[in-house]
C-alpha cells in the first residue's frame, strides 16, 4: 500500500489515516516512508464514521468471571505482579489494548469476538489504581463484585481517551506499540 500511495499520489499530497485503525508501529513506519516521499498524513477526521452510516453497534455480550481455580491466580495477585514488572521497566502506568491480555489480567471472559472468549475493553493500570474501560451494561453484579474485590475501578469504554489525556505530563506509560492504536498513543 505504501508503494502504491507514493507512486499514485506524488509529493505534496495528503493521505488521511484513521488513527484508531493503525498501530503505533504501523503509523510510524507509514509516516517515515510517506514523509520521505514528500507526502503528508492527516489523522484529525474520522472519515470512516462519516461514510459508514449503517455501521453495526458494538457487541454487547455480558462479562463472565473466569474463576481463579481455572487460571491459578486472582486478579489482585496478577495486578501486584504486574506492578512489580512495571516498576522494573520504569513505567508507572500501563495501557492494555489487546483483548486477550485484558481477559487474562482481569480474569474475565466474554463473547464480543466470534470464537474468542474476550470483551471489547481497555485496561489502564497505574502504580496505585486499575481501571477497566468497558460498556457498563456488560457488567453483572457478580463481575462488579469480582472487580471491586481486586480494587479495579470501571469506566465507560468511551472514556479511555479523556483518561489518557488527563494523565500528568511526567507519567511514564508503557504500551505495546504493535497492539496499541495510534489514536490512544496521541491522547
Listing of model-derived features with the role each one plays in the protein:
Residues 1-187:
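A composition/biophysics-driven feature that prefers long, compositionally simple stretches
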Amino acid at each position: 500500500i505504501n508503494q502504491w500511495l507514493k507512486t499514485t499520489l506524488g509529493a505534496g499530497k495528503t493521505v488521511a489515516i484513521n488513527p484508531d485503525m493503525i498501530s503505533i508501529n504501523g503509523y510510524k513506519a507509514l509516516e517515515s516512508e510517506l514523509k520521505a516521499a514528500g507526502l503528508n498524513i492527516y489523522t484529525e477526521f474520522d472519515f470512516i464514521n462519516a461514510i459508514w452510516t449503517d455501521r453495526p453497534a458494538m457487541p454487547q455480550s455480558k462479562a463472565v468471571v473466569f474463576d481463579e481455580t481455572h487460571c491459578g491466580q486472582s486478579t489482585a495477585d496478577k495486578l501486584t505482579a504486574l506492578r512489580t514488572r512495571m516498576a522494573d521497566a520504569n513505567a508507572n502506568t500501563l495501557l492494555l489494548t489487546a483483548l486477550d491480555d485484558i481477559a487474562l489480567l482481569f480474569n474475565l471472559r466474554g463473547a464480543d469476538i466470534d470464537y474468542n472468549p474476550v470483551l471489547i475493553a481497555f485496561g489502564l493500570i497505574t502504580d496505585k489504581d486499575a481501571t477497566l474501560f468497558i460498556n457498563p451494561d456488560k457488567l453483572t453484579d457478580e463481575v462488579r463484585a469480582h472487580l471491586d474485590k481486586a480494587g479495579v475501578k470501571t469506566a465507560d469504554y468511551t472514556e479511555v481517551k479523556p483518561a489518557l489525556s488527563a494523565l500528568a505530563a511526567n507519567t511514564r506509560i508503557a504500551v505495546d506499540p504493535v497492539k496499541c492504536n495510534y489514536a490512544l498513543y496521541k491522547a
